[in-house]
């Protein structure tokens, strides 16, 4: 199992531009994400996120599960067919409970379309990815703008990532964002 640990912040385009100016070159990735759940929302009820994302056109399927330490369990693989992605993810170690939960099928529930500017940051005691995401979240017939900054631990200790993210938040006056893209897009679908 992979473990995801990240801190997210709401940002303005001007704040993102200032961060980009400070840190130099970023890699640009076009993201088109569809989030899936069961018709009775069994995954969301258990705080499980299931998605297929096209990253510069390449299909990547991911499942994220709650983790006791505040991070999330994460399994990911390149996979084109959403109908068979749960089985494929379980084959690489995702909880087999997912097969039972999704036995009745999965449906698309919401999505996101955005551009990610990503950069690896070397920290004392580890590395992190600094990501600037700008685009839209979609649910039902509604959409809202997306503009956020993510700092994700890639290796090393949580503390180094937390320290870097906090200093970034102070310097650029960023506001913590405690809800995932999925949860915010899901709310749009529910309000429709």
Where does each model-flagged region fall?
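Phosphate-end processing signature that detects enzymes handling 5′-triphosphorylated RNA
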Residues: 1-192
